[in-house]
Regions:
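Bacterial N-terminal signal peptides
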Residues: 1-9
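Surface-exposed, glycine-biased beta-strand/turn segments
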Residues: 13-82, 86-91, 101, 118-119, ...
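Aromatic/His-enriched, Gly/Pro-containing loop or helix-boundary segments
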Residues: 96, 104-131
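A short hydrophobic beta-strand segment most commonly corresponding to one strand
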Residues: 152-161
Length: 170
């Protein structure tokens, strides 16, 4: 009970900051969740929202705010394919389990994979390389990595510290 009250107080303070940031939805259909922020998992707390994608892969994912693609990774487990967008308000949004990235980003990933003869990669980008605007399609939803069904794993983090923030309040 005390832990719940303490977590509730922390999330409330964070919610006020997030509401000021003017984010949009990552999808153009009504949001239904399969998992919430802070849910207890076998060995950790869930650090984001799992958004259902109507039981299918390939749904366009919209960038929730202006910023730049700062990182993409392709992994066998975990997020599978993941894209990180750094925003000027000091937050980074993370989109996990995607099936593919926007064409310009996907081309960069493929070029790296072929040049280095590896599927797995973790690429970091400079602010001017891949700028994005709120609403731009940055990826397609998937079921990649450690995923039990099609969905988008969406996280918000403080860019400087990596601290997780509940995306729900926006």
């Amino acid at each position: 009970m005390i832990l719940a009250l303490a977590l509730g107080g922390m999330l409330s303070a964070q919610a006020q900051h997030v509401q000021e940031s003017n984010f949009c939805s990552p999808f153009d259909f009504p949001i239904l969740l399969s998992a919430n922020f802070g849910e207890l998992r076998p060995n950790h707390f869930h650090n984001g929202l799992d958004i259902k994608t109507q039981g299918v892969t390939g749904k366009p994912i919209h960038c929730i705010a202006d910023g730049h693609v700062s990182r993409v990774a392709v992994l066998h487990g975990g997020y599978g394919q993941v894209i990180y967008v750094t925003h000027p308000n000091g937050l980074t949004s993370v989109y996990g389990h995607v099936i593919s990235f926007a064409k310009n980003i996907q081309a960069c990933v493929r070029q790296y994979q072929y040049a280095h003869e590896t599927f797995v990669c973790d690429l970091k980008f400079q602010p001017g390389q891949f700028p994005v605007k709120k609403g731009d399609i940055i990826a397609l939803s998937g079921n990649e990595g450690a995923s039990a069904g099609p969905h988008l794993h969406l996280e918000l983090r403080r860019t400087e510290t990596g601290e997780y923030i509940d995306p729900m309040p926006y």
